[in-house]
Amino acid sequence: YGQHCDNTWIMGGKPFANTRADLSFTLFLANPDEYSGGELSIFDGRNSTDIKLQAGKMVIYDSGSLHQVKEVTEGTRICCVGWVQSWIANPQMRTLLTDMDLQIGRLKKLDNIPRSEFDELHRIYNDLLRQNMR
């Protein structure tokens, strides 16, 4: 497939009618040594990253990212692709909330964080989540 971004809306039958595509995924079903070429190339605005994973591995990326599948020159590339609607529509807020959640998880493992400080950070995270869920 040539370079493109995925459509914003997935039009399908119930229960998926008018589903917003926030995240795209590619599940690799063939091992990299079974075909030549066929890399999923994702462009982040400055650089392209080529991805070709083992069978059973999945990559998830923003549906608005420019991406393409490079030409398969030998063998057969077998993948399952799909789209996910996030509770958080704004991609920047989705990234911020994910980063915050990961950091809270790291802090939770430390012994020297007062419980009251951790609880306040967790409250702020959940308030942001509530404000941005759709």
Model features per residue range: what roles?
Residues Y1-C80, V84-T98:
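Catalytic core of non-heme Fe(II) oxygenases with the double-stranded beta-helix
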Residues A55-V59, I78, E120-R123, L128-L129, ...:
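Long, contiguous binding/interaction regions
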Residues I88-I124, L128:
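Charged/polar low-complexity intrinsically disordered segments, enriched in acidic residues
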